[in-house]
Amino acid sequence: MYQLSLNERCEEIEDIMKKTVLIVGVAGRFGRQCASAMRDAGWHVRGFARTTEKANCIDGVEPYVGDIMDPTALGNAADGADVIVQAANPPYQLWKTLLLEMNQAVIDVAINVGATVVVPQNVYIFGKKGGVWKEDAPHVGSNALARIRMTMEAAYKKAAINHGLPILAFRMGDFIDGPDHRPSGNWFENHITKAVATGDFTYPGPMDRDHAWAYLPDVARAIVDILNTPNAVVGHLDLNFPGWVLTGASMKTAIEHAVGKPMKRKKMPWVPMNVIALWSAPLRNVVSLRYLWNVPHRLGTDRFDRLLPHFEATDPTEAFTNRWET
């Protein structure tokens, strides 16, 4: 009878001890970066997406195909998972009809399998008054998107209180993808740096206002560090990510250093955008967030700093250089 060698036994024990994470929406920016970072940190990573191609988008990730609204498909993918990363996010125009249901589906499955949930949060809920937005800052529903997010966040807090579900609510500024970036519809790629190749830098607001940014490779690295910290996530843990605080001018300078040439500053065409927004729901939602470019803001990160006191963010110029070299 064949007996396992010592090395094979060690590998078998190692596989058993590996923690399992399910990334829901693995093909998106946030999902891809989390999947790669957790795989590299030794986690057993499962990727859940609507198509086989998307579920297989990251090497070394076990693919699961299905719809987030299908409890059987999502439940099968989550079975035995220690952590679920909720990285699925519909377009703005579908938030009203889909966002709450999608996140409730994740909550229900997480309660059933006993998994910790990591859910990314944004800054929309802080309203139009700038400054330092701390974790305990009041939530203000100043627009429709903010009110939907507030309802969604309340559902996670309710699950933590009523069911003891561990939640890592990770709040960040606007996303900036890593060197392996793929086409997406965010501010940085679709507007600000869309024409970098031709020397244009299109900024949505005044060039002297602080703006919160989240470099996703750093975000994923921080999430791994938190999840690998014993007893870090108990109940509902609301954390603000430090990220980068950049003005338009400092971002432009960093990009100029990265690409090795001066950039011509252009302004966003807000006037025609406002007109088109009268009958375009997607653009109407974009226009409703214009204030974030006029109001200087940053995230207060006291809780994060206590939890990960030695965390160091990637330098923006280094990140931009890596991005445009690839």
Predicted regions and their residues:
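NAD(P)-dependent short-chain dehydrogenase/reductase
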Residues: 174-210
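Short-chain dehydrogenase/reductase
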Residues: 96-100, 131, 142-154, 181-189, ...
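NAD(P)H-binding glycine-rich loop region in Rossmannoid oxidoreductase-like domains
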Residues: 53-113
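Mid/C-terminal beta-alpha module of Rossmann-like enzyme folds, strongest
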Residues: 6-20, 222-286, 301, 306, ...
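N-terminal Rossmann NAD(P)H-binding glycine-rich loop of SDR-like oxidoreductase domains
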Residues: 21-41
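Conserved beta-loop-beta element that borders a ligand/cofactor-binding pocket
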Residues: 122, 154-180
